[in-house]
Amino acid sequence: MYKVGDIVQCFVTGFKEYGIFVKIDNNYNGLIHISEISSDFVNNVKEYAEIGEKIYAKVIEADNNAKLLKLSIKTIDYKNDGKERKEKEEKKQEEK
């Protein structure tokens, strides 16, 4: 079972103009809506990932009965480790 705030590893399975579809595990699927991809304007969701690519996403809504997750990559390092971007930026500032 997943809960809001969890960071999940997932694999990109498809695209629609409104978002990125992912598979989390054998039971769960998810959608990263276009509004949860970036704080900047997103013209084409395909610019952010590729089919089959492993990414990380943050759970913003979970329907554990239907095994569907609404996900966000807006504030995390979705290509690497799924950690909040702000934390990484703060650490870089501290190192200077």
What are these regions (language model features)?
Residues 1-96:
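Single-stranded RNA-binding regions, centering on S1/OB-family and related RNA-binding modules
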